[in-house]
């Protein structure tokens, strides 16, 4: 009946009543009859109910041949996470005990902002609590969704960033197609390197992105292939190799009176047959086709694996990766690697090698102020004992700057970016400039004993005998 009956020792006591409830967040894009509370992201059972009443119904309605690897419906995409965080679910006390090795009940006052034991002990509990939520979200939401998708013959794509109560890399590693996002505005932030790092580490061929997103000020039918090209080249050089236009809308109307048709409000480049330059878009599409084909081939050549433990990326960059300090000097490539990727690494001829075949020359650790967990310290020690080069965040730039870069150019004001891939004895570099105007520089590549060729993705022309 809500009455507490107990005998307490002498002294002053505060009685805390601790409970949990559903988040007051509803799906933002549902139809009038499709609105409701967001699914519990820490519960496999809740996700199965949601899946059975949404995706599975769609797959069954389409029937054999229309949903699956050869049908028009091939992929389920988890968009950027924008529905608020979550830190509890039914039975989470058992999940926490399995993860942390101790009961959560004595520590519940800490979740109400109180110190339990000492400040240091309470901080350690917070760390264990966050890690338990992190792993539960990645496994019970993304991991279970991937299992359900595969059971329906579908692939899972994930945009692993936003308000997620998890680690971006751990969450995204469950994707068959790691997916990013970039906006049409040239200097806007993007998350391509994060998705590309996951793909390289886990052996995923495709790195996709929600591409050329806009708001009302940047959209409004103002974008053209010319205005989009510089940003497109830049994200290609960050690791992207599949464009997903935001947005391409079905336009069922033929009457001019119904133009411009379905627009998805103010968001996104209007990429469909109602565009004024639609009939002239073939060269733009052929350009992207040629770029993406080559960027999907071969293996990524990378100097540095930058170890980012759970929570590190979000703590350092929040929602803007451009603000993150990078320990790698210009001319050297790098990937972000997670806790699970670190555990999978082995050393071969002094290089760090992953089961996917991805190789790195150097492992760079987080700043010394970022405390590593015992398992992480043991993993780093194992690799160092096997002969890997491991540098601290603070020393990495100085050590690497004394070496030959993979790419160098004679005009630092040019601010170029590039990506290097290799296959069957051939090396190819895609070089990008952030400018919308021509840029002339002399570029050097860390390749010897080869004769260069220039491949033009605008025309498909290959020029041999390039001066070098």
Q: Which residues are covered by each model-predicted region?
A:
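Mature N-terminal, pre-catalytic/accessory segment of carbohydrate-active enzymes
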Residues: 1-72
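Carbohydrate-binding surfaces of carbohydrate-active enzymes
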Residues: 57-75, 79-468
């Amino acid at each position: 009946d809500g009455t507490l009956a107990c005998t307490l020792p002498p002294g002053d006591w505060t009685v805390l009543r601790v409970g949990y409830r559903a988040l007051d967040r509803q799906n933002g894009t549902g139809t009038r009859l499709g609105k409701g509370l967001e699914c519990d992201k820490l519960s496999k059972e809740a996700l199965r109910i949601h899946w059975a009443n949404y995706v599975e119904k769609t797959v069954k309605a389409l029937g054999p041949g229309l949903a699956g690897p050869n049908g028009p419906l091939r992929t389920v995409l988890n968009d950027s996470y924008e529905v608020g965080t979550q830190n509890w679910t039914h039975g989470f006390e058992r999940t926490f005990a399995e993860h942390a090795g101790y009961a959560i009940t004595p520590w519940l006052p800490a979740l109400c902002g109180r110190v339990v034991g000492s400040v240091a002990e309470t901080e350690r509990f917070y760390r264990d609590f966050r890690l338990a939520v992190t792993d539960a979200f990645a496994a019970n939401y993304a991991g279970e969704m991937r299992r359900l998708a595969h059971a329906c013959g579908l692939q899972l794509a994930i945009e692993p960033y936003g308000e997620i109560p998890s680690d971006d890399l751990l969450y995204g590693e469950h994707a068959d197609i790691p997916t990013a996002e970039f906006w049409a505005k040239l200097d806007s932030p993007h998350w391509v390197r994060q998705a590309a790092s996951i793909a390289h580490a886990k052996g995923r061929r495709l790195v996709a992105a929600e591409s050329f997103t806009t708001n009302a000020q940047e959209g409004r039918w103002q974008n053209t292939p010319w205005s989009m090209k510089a940003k497109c080249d830049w994200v290609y050089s960050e690791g992207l190799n599949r464009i997903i236009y935001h947005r391409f809308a079905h336009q069922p109307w033929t009457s001019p009176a119904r133009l411009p048709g379905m627009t998805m409000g103010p968001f996104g480049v209007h990429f469909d047959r109602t565009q004024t330059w639609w009939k002239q878009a073939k060269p733009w599409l052929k350009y992207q086709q040629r770029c993406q084909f080559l960027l999907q081939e071969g293996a990524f050549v990378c100097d540095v694996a930058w170890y980012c433990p759970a929570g590190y990326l979000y703590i350092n960059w929040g929602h803007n990766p451009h603000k993150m300090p990078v320990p790698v000097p210009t001319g050297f490539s790098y990937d972000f690697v997670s806790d699970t990727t670190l555990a999978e690494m082995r050393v071969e001829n002094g290089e760090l090698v992953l089961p996917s075949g991805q190789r790195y020359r150097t492992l760079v650790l987080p700043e010394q102020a970022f405390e590593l967990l015992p398992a992480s310290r043991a993993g780093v020690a194992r690799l160092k004992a096997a002969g890997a080069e491991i540098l601290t965040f603070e020393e990495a730039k100085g050590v690497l700057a004394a070496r030959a870069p993979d790419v160098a150019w004679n005009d630092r004001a040019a601010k170029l970016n590039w990506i290097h891939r290799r296959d069957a004895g051939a090396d190819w570099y895609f070089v990008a400039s952030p400018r919308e105007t021509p840029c002339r520089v002399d570029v050097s590549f860390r390749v010897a004993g080869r004769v260069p060729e220039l491949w033009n993705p605008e025309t498909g022309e290959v020029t041999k005998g390039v001066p070098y």
